[in-house]
């Protein structure tokens, strides 16, 4: 037995009445026009009644379909059926009225000539834009007008791919792909996010639900301690977080007062530490308490703390079993399409080791999570090594590259690779409140402290250290039984606790670099305690071309000193970059340091608050899943032309600016360059890291043919590179002045 809703019954009745009255109105119009042309009021009143019934009919149907989307691809029994129904109805009425008009016109005017004149003055309803009923019913008439694709550089290429490959996997048809351009566009905008959403399409209900979940800052660590207690591998990080807890809580409260942290979406975040898994073969967690490398653990603990305090939902994995458990919903999915439903994760923080584990675990589903990845990568990955086929063509054999990610998805320890993103870390202050009161009373001694806790770092450095010893005492913190490279006059304290090291630094005037290790946190700790840093200069610069340490790393970056960040972004009076083999230069620097009085200095970006600000900006603004979201804002763009032999990184740095790779796409067309007075008489597309570029003699422009190859690194031998630079906040290099 069939049941009908009152609304459907009402709309059917109204439809029947509308057709009936339409016919009656037409007949009466004919009658009144011939017999009673002096009474237009009656016809007008009847017309108003018909219009009123029509409005009620449309309103009834609209009420039935108020929650559905319009358009030929919206599905059956939706608002688009309303158009089909009205199309049939109106077509029927218009055909009848057209015939009536023709007959009435002939009867009234009597001649074809007059008829022509009359229709010129008052156009027939039928002569207006015709409605093709068959097209509407078949879903053809409503054209799929595509929105502008600005900011979605991959959209056009993906549409071309879909045209050829949409039958390669039945999942595309399950999502409504039917071979038409509009269905391709809907899939690529709503399922895979490569294209802008069509304006008439409803929003994804899962996205709407996600936006209802807002992040609220946290001011205690109870939940985080509970999560980390389950893993012995996290012991060192947990102790660091506990030591710094008060500073972190003060920082999040301070940041919340300075900028609006409300109405932020709470993200589901996976943190997978591949370097701590048993399968990695590393023993980092085991050696953390016995002089092993700590840089990665420092960065991971500070990242986890920041994500937690900013109010996001985090899940931490340090084993393959945990990773599989978290991602079990998509593990084994062989489909080329993403899984339907609520997202498991929205952001994934991972390292290079974990990246390989993650890809193997997910299988084909990997492609749907690539855009969510943020890869902790201390030394950086340049576009030349990230692009698999390009790296292959150049003969690069690094085991760490060829991931084909957006280069900005790699997060570095220092802001040394502008093609990547600067994540950083926090320089720890090991002192409690009573210590701080006492430490300010400590008088600086005429002494230096050498940066090098391993005996081998001191090899062949005696002549350099002798110069320093002429002017002051030399102290060290070398551990281990071997001290054969350490001069006899050095006072070695062995391994010190963080607190004791802080007191020693407060007594010291000079922190002495030996040239290795590269880019460590210790010089920043020394500067924060009021020491000057003697930073060894490298001439020629060190890179994978001349230094074994860098061989195999996915970068051709050249280090001009032991600590390029300190050299470029801090400088004198805190940092003195000198040639160790130039006695006069070393002596002059030591004398100047002894004669100066400097205050402790800590760049904001290496404080708890600075890191919270930076990570929050990245989470809120960086988006590699929805086309190229315009951040940093274009207002920060400053275009520079590099001379032949000069990279974009260099030319921007010379102007106290930063190369900003996200702006390259706005300099990759002839019309774009006209704004900056660069006129191309000819142009071509080329897939290389050295373009876009300009050859002044012939005014020939070369544009980028592969978006993953945009690069701030690399110098063209004959062309001028066209470089996108931006400003930055002093002490917060990752952010431009308009970025917050």
UniProtKB/Swiss-Prot annotation:
Topological domains, Lumenal: 31-740
Molecular function per GO: acetylglucosaminyltransferase activity; alpha-1,6-mannosylglycoprotein 6-beta-N-acetylglucosaminyltransferase activity; glycosyltransferase activity; manganese ion binding; protein phosphatase inhibitor activity
Instruction: Kindly give the membrane topology term recorded for this protein.
Output: Single-pass type II membrane protein
Q: Where in the cell?
A: Golgi apparatus membrane; Perikaryon
Pfam families per record:
Glyco_transf_18 (PF15024), MGT5A_N (PF15027)
Tell me the disulfide pairings in this chain.
144-182, 155-195, 171-337, 371-625, 648-723, 652-725, 659-712, 680-701, 736-739
Protein name, per record: Alpha-1,6-mannosylglycoprotein 6-beta-N-acetylglucosaminyltransferase A
Q: Which organism is it from?
A: Mus musculus (Mouse)
């Amino acid at each position: 037995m069939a049941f009908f809703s009152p609304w459907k019954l009402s709309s059917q009745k109204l439809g029947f009445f509308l057709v009936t009255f339409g016919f009656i109105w037409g007949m009466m119009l004919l009658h009144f026009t011939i017999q009673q042309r002096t009474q237009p009021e009656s016809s007008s009143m009847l017309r108003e009644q018909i219009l009123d019934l029509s409005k009620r009919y449309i309103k009834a149907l609209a009420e039935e379909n108020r929650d559905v989307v319009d358009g030929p691809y919206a599905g059956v029994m939706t608002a688009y059926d309303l158009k089909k129904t009205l199309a049939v109805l109106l077509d029927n009425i218009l055909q009848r009225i057209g015939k009536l008009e023709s007959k009435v016109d002939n009867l009234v005017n009597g001649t074809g000539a007059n008829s022509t004149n009359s229709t010129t003055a008052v156009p027939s309803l039928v002569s207006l834009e015709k409605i093709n009923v068959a097209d509407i019913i078949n879903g053809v008439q409503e054209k799929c007008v595509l929105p502008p694709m600005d900011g979605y550089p991959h959209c056009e290429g993906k549409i071309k791919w879909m045209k050829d490959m949409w039958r390669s996997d039945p999942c595309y048809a399950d999502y409504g792909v039917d071979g038409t351009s509009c269905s391709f566009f809907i899939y690529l905008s709503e399922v895979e996010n490569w294209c802008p959403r069509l304006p008439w399409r409803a929003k994804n209900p899962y996205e709407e639900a996600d936006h209802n979940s807002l992040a609220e800052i946290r001011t205690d660590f109870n939940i985080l301690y509970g999560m980390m207690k389950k893993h012995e591998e996290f012991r060192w990080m947990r102790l660091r977080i506990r030591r710094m807890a008060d500073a972190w809580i003060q920082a999040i409260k301070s940041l919340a007062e300075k900028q609006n942290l409300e109405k932020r979406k709470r993200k589901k975040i996976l943190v997978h530490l591949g370097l701590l898994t048993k399968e990695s073969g590393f023993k980092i967690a085991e050696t953390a308490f016995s002089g092993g490398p700590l840089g990665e653990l420092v960065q991971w603990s500070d990242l986890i703390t920041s994500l937690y305090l900013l109010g996001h939902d985090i899940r931490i994995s340090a084993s393959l079993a945990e990773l599989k458990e978290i991602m079990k919903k998509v593990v084994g999915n062989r489909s080329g399409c993403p899984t339907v439903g609520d997202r498991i994760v929205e952001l994934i923080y991972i390292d290079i080791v974990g990246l390989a584990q993650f890809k193997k675990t997910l299988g084909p589903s990997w492609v749907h999570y690539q855009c969510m990845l943020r890869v902790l990568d201390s030394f950086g990955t340049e576009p030349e090594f990230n692009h698999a086929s390009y790296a292959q063509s150049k003969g690069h054999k690094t085991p760490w590259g060829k991931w084909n990610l957006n280069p900005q998805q790699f997060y570095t320890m220092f802001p040394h690779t502008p093609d990547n993103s600067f994540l950083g870390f926090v320089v720890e202050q090991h002192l409690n409140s009573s210590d701080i009161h006492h430490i300010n009373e400590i008088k600086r001694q005429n002494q230096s402290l050498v940066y090098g806790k391993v005996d081998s770092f001191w090899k062949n450095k005696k002549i350099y250290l002798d110069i320093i010893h002429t002017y002051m005492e030399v102290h060290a913190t070398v551990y281990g039984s071997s001290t054969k490279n350490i001069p006899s006059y050095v006072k070695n304290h062995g391994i010190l606790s963080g607190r004791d090291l802080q007191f020693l630094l407060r007594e010291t005037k000079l922190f002495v670099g030996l040239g290795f290790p590269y880019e460590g946190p210790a010089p920043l700790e020394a500067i924060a305690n009021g020491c000057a840093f003697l930073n060894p200069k490298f001439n020629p610069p060190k890179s994978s071309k001349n230094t074994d340490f860098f061989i195999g790393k996915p970068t051709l970056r050249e280090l001009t000193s032991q600590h390029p960040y300190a050299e470029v972004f801090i400088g004198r009076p805190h940092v003195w970059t000198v040639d160790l083999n130039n006695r006069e230069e070393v002596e002059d620097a030591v004398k100047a340091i002894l004669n100066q009085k400097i205050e402790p200095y800590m760049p904001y970006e290496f404080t708890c608050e600075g890191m919270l600000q930076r990570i929050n900006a990245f989470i809120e603004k960086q988006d590699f899943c929805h086309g190229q979201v315009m951040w940093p804002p274009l207002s920060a763009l400053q275009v520079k032309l590099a001379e032949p032999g000069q990279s974009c990184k260099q030319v921007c740095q010379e102007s106290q600016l930063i190369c900003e790779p996200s702006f390259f796409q706005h300099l990759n067309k002839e019309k774009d360059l006209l704004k900056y007075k660069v006129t191309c008489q000819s142009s071509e597309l080329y897939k290389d890291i050295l373009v876009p570029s300009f050859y002044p003699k012939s005014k020939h422009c070369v544009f980028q043919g592969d978006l993953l190859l945009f690069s701030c690194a690399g110098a063209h031998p004959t062309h001028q590179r066209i470089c996108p630079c931006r400003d930055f906040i002093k002490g917060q290099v990752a952010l431009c002045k308009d970025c917050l």
